[in-house]
Swiss-Prot record:
Active site: K159, E247, C281, E459
Molecular function terms, GO-annotated: betaine-aldehyde dehydrogenase (NAD+) activity; metal ion binding
Protein name per Swiss-Prot or TrEMBL: Betaine aldehyde dehydrogenase
Gene that specifies this protein: betB
This protein's record includes keyword Amino-acid biosynthesis: no
Organism: Marinomonas sp. (strain MWYL1)
Free-text comment on the cofactor: Binds 2 potassium ions per subunit.
Function according to Swiss-Prot or TrEMBL: Involved in the biosynthesis of the osmoprotectant glycine betaine. Catalyzes the irreversible oxidation of betaine aldehyde to the corresponding acid.
Cross-referenced SUPFAM superfamilies: ALDH-like (SSF53720)
Amino acid sequence: MAHQQQYIHGRYHASTSGEHFETINPATGEVIATVEHAGQAELDAAVESAKQGQKVWSAMSPVERGRILKKAAELLRENNEELARLEVLDTGKPLQEAIVVDIQTGADVIEYYAGLTDKIQGDYQDLGNGNFFYTRREPLGICAGIGAWNYPIQIAMWKSGPALAAGNAMIFKPSEETPLTALKLAEIFTEAGLPDGVFNVIQGDARTGQLITNHPDIDKVSFTGEVGTGKKVMAASAQSLKQVTMELGGKSPMIIFPDMPVDQAVSAAMLANFYTQGEVCTNGTRVFVHADMLDAFTKELKQRTEAMIIGDPMDMDTQVGALISKDHMQKVLGYIQAAKDAGATLLCGGYQVTENGLDKGAFVAPTVFTDCTDDMPQVRDEIFGPVMSVLSFTDEDEVIARANDTKLGLAAGVFTKDFARAHRVINQLQAGICWINSWGASPAEMPVGGYKQSGIGRENGIETLYHYTQNKSVFVDLNDIQSPY
């Protein structure tokens, strides 16, 4: 992995800019690889390649496209462990997570859309008097995917699966923090029989992203990342009226009612806050706990959180890995200090972990604050780290209003044994992804996306195919032409 290039038209492609960047193992601070930075010349080459590839790909029968995508899913699963280990090197997340989630669930999405390639169809309606119309769902053309660094290969698969199933080509730019596994995905697509140019990977930072959003021959941009960056991507895409899908940030509430067993409530809260070191956009970082169970909840939460294993992400016993970078770690620690300054009570964690040889990495102990109020900075802002805020409530209507008091609306969850209450509350929460007595489940069949400033469009599910196709209406008149001229 010493030196990486762009992947264009089925092969590695050297950049002409002469610029490169390093990708760092956040658990050790060591350089994994140097990566060539793409400029305008590389993007133009990727676009021309995509035009050629998309022409071939869209001309294939849907069944043939499905076979190739299914083969790619099989190859991904065969290479699961190798890909998971590479993902761990690049992200710092625990191997015990990556080996069961990142590649496997991404492959599920590829396989799901492989089965839908021949299900994309239009409508027909007889209008009488020898007239009828039909519609065709046609590919957009060239789609761009811009990925985030928390689930690099999974995001690449979530974006490429529906795009390719619909007959498009995709140019994918991974985050410069995690550039490696997207290249492996490209190799696997090629091995599976995908025509050259249908999935290209270009590397770089925000400058490369700007080149993508400004390129007139790219028809759609699908972006996953932070809200502010998403707004910039959307604004730039508007200059050429590109279609956009935005999967942005969240500050998601989970509401725990007192009929929920304490051990299950604590399990849910820990899962919703500490998985992947808290670097998950759907994290339930605002944990609303009914006052009647608050003491028992916080007691068990403290005990179990302090028992979590922090260590080498490659060790299968490790439950908490490294944050993505030292810079991001400082941001997280800054929010922890801001929470203390605002008057929140630190229940546990709240510090950089340096013992047992972890001093060169970006490790932060899972952190829980109690005595939180809705206006505190760690309650209002997306931190993207292992920081949980516990808030007390007594009234159902009150907690719904508080849960909705945010500009974001990505996810929400309700925990109760009263299913009438569960559905009543869920129906009032302003979030696009909701769970009842669960957190984080995202099967390929289920469309996901945000309300409010958490996003536009959906990923996964049948609905997403509509975001990667355009509707053509064809009117047919079987009669002689009638004209006043």
